[in-house]
């Protein structure tokens, strides 16, 4: 998939290592310096809008202190009553965050509740304030889009390809290494569903169905997120007749206009 292009931040951490947005931004900034020092332009690719936003706008997370006792209480609630119950609490105090954060992303739900508990403020409002900051970077924020039916077809094909490429065997190996569903590394789409299958909670067919369904929901949430971002440049694949060369030409033209790259 990398097609000879140097990629960063892939296969850098062990499955049991903690990973969060602050660590992502710290690591990404180091690579940005390295790439710029090489005289090249970095391309940030991905679908997690919150992480992209945090990097582009240099969002400050220092106000988000820690209350270990309260955090443990929330973790206990999630274990006893389930992720949806905890998500319901967040929905009551911060509906905007509840809309943006999936119930299964327990760590982010807890972080949002903890922020509210400590500051009396909604983390969604804090993030919105941070989002209004001027970015220290000159950048172009492209989001490719397509009609929903075609997007869902691509998601289904991708999930099928993941299974064929050995996702079950990969999760089986991770499980044998002691990786559990509580770990951040096992919260990714596909991993927790296959883990449920390996634990006897569902059939493989059911697990695949759930992965496809949850990936569609994720795509829908991400599109909603990107629509809120003020600097997004939308590229409708259908409008370009699904011509990748035409899309690339348009992107290059915009990059030249923004003086991110120079005219050849």
Regions found by a protein language model. Name each.
Residues 1-264:
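Phosphate/pyrophosphate-binding catalytic cores of soluble transferases and nucleic-acid-acting enzymes
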């Amino acid at each position: 998939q990398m097609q000879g292009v140097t990629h960063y931040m892939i296969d850098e951490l062990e499955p049991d290592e903690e990973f969060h947005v602050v660590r992502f931004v710290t690591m990404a900034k180091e690579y940005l310096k390295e790439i710029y020092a090489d005289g090249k332009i970095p391309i940030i690719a991905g679908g997690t809008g919150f992480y992209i936003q945090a990097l582009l706008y240099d969002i400050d997370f220092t106000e988000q202190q820690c209350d270990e006792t309260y955090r443990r209480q929330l973790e206990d609630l999630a274990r006893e009553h389930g992720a949806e119950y905890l998500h319901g609490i967040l929905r009551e105090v911060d509906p905007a965050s509840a809309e943006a954060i999936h119930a299964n992303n327990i760590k982010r739900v807890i972080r949002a509740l903890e922020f509210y508990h400590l500051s009396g403020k909604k983390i969604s409002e804090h993030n919105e304030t941070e989002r209004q900051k001027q970015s220290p970077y000159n950048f172009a924020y492209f989001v490719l889009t397509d009609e929903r039916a075609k997007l869902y077809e691509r998601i289904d094909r991708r999930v099928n390809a993941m299974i064929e490429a050995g996702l079950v065997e990969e999760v089986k190996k991770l499980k044998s290494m002691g990786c559990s569903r509580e770990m951040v590394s096992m919260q990714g789409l596909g991993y927790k569903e296959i883990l449920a299958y390996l634990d006897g909670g569902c059939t493989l067919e059911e697990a695949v169905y759930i992965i496809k369904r949850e990936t569609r929901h994720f795509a829908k949430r991400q599109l909603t997120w990107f629509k809120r971002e003020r600097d997004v440049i939308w590229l409708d694949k259908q409008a370009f007749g699904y011509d990748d060369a035409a899309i690339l030409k348009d992107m290059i033209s915009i990059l030249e206009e923004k003086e991110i790259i120079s005219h050849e």
